Regions:
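Phosphate/pyrophosphate-binding loops at sites that engage ATP/ADP/AMP, CoA/4′-phosphopantetheine
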Residues: 84-99, 281-298, 317, 349-357
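Active-site-adjacent elements of ketosynthase-type condensing enzymes
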Residues: 111-117, 163-184, 242-259, 306-315, ...
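Conserved beta-ketoacyl condensing-enzyme motif
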Residues: 42, 46-125, 131, 136, ...
């Protein structure tokens, strides 16, 4: 099975508290007839305490329409993309020319040539690098991207591939729109980038990981030491066991963009938590293919759509209270980063202590990546350590 070898994240240098951003928006919009009570209630309801922004806050007032916003997006997206991929390659000491596939995903700006093509002029990839730009999947593209790269590596098991996500949601803000959806969006979404290195199971890096896993398992078998069990956890990388796509018919108006002459206007319906609460049969069906139940999953990496969505997923799957607190913390500290969020959560997971193995009969640790987005749809990826 394909394996996730390493992850990296990058953020703009500009970080602001929610109070700072709300105050600036309130001051600008009150001149346009803003209902301050509604604004304050919605800004507080998203539970975000701070976010990274692509530009200094004062620069947003100078942007005049989609052309300015998209140009700013392209500049910062390339800077973050170059930084996060360079960091990823440095972590693994893997030369850029050994990467065979580069998949990029974004939904917050438009570029032709696309981001990964432009990055080939900044990073020493091979000229025959295969490139796949994703656009339109929105928030679920981080999980979907992992799934599609893993599908590719099953066909090319001796290769290495990178998934890049760059989302600069702040540059889609509609400055003249006082709708509830835009007010929520203005308080919910942040900016950032993430990259993930995956390899097929015949790649040298995968073999190194597998050898380390086997050696530590053998040591534990003969010594029975919990200390060595923890060492095994630290050395093993997750395998991408499988993926599942879920589509809810006749729901295209629930979430997405309304593409206007002023740019990308948020479409955000009230039905998102309702769809989130309907995930259980789909997740259970997916897990049953591997003889697993919900209680066998010890690592949940769920996209932070918003506090109501997180609560709906947790209750809908009948997960123990606080199971998704990692996601809540992410939302609180840096907001919803669209497709980048779940990859940032993956990075935090792989670089921190993992929960104990769940399920009395489980030998391995299982994790679930779960994201929802436009269409309305969801994407699941099952991980195995």
């Amino acid at each position: 099975m394909p394996q996730i070898i390493s992850t990296a994240t990058a953020f703009p240098v500009h970080y602001y508290s929610q109070d700072e951003m709300s105050s600036a928006l309130r001051a600008a919009w009150i001149k346009k007839g803003l209902d301050v009570a509604v604004f304050d209630r919605l800004q507080k309801a998203v539970t975000v305490e701070g976010r990274y922004l692509a530009l200094p806050m004062s620069e947003y007032y100078k942007l005049d329409g989609f052309t300015d916003c998209n140009r700013a997006w392209l500049k910062v997206a390339l800077e973050l993309g170059e930084s996060v991929i360079s960091d990823l390659l440095e972590k693994t000491s893997l030369p850029a020319e050994e990467i065979k596939l580069l998949m990029s995903t974004t939904v917050t700006g438009v570029a032709v040539p696309s981001l990964e093509a432009r990055l080939m002029n900044r990073i020493d990839f091979a000229s025959d690098l295969k490139r796949i730009p994703l656009f339109g999947l929105g928030c679920l593209a981080g999980t979907a991207g992992i799934a599609r790269v893993a599908d590719y590596l099953k066909g090319y098991p001796d290769e290495a591939a990178i998934l890049l996500s760059v989302e600069l949601c702040s540059l889609t803000l509609q400055a003249e729109d006082l709708s509830v959806a835009n007010i929520i969006s203005s308080g919910l979404f942040g900016d950032g980038a993430a990259a993930v290195l995956l390899v097929g199971d015949k790649h040298a890096l995968a073999n190194e990981v597998e050898v380390q896993r086997v050696k530590n398992t053998e040591f534990q078998r003969f010594n029975g030491s919990s200390e060595k069990s923890q060492k095994q956890t630290e050395l093993s990388h997750p395998q991408v066991l499988s993926s599942r796509s879920i589509f809810f018919p006749d729901s295209e108006e629930v979430m997405g963009w309304d593409v206007t002459d002023r740019g990308l206007k948020i479409v955000l319906g009230q039905g998102v938590p309702g769809y989130a609460s309907q995930l259980r049969p789909h997740v259970e069906s997916f897990l049953s293919e591997f003889g697993l139940a919900l209680t066998d999953v010890s690592v949940w990496l769920t996209h932070p759509g918003g506090p109501k969505v997180i609560d709906a997923i947790e209750s809908g799957l009948d997960l123990p209270t606080k199971t998704l607190d990692r996601t809540r913390k992410h939302l609180r500290e840096i907001g919803n980063l669209s497709s980048t969020s779940v990859l940032v959560l993956l990075d935090e997971c792989l670089n921190g202590p993992l929960p104990e193995i769940a399920g009395k009969s489980c030998v391995y640790r299982y994790g679930m990546m779960l994201s929802m987005g436009p269409a309305f749809s969801a994407e699941l990826v099952l991980l195995k350590w």
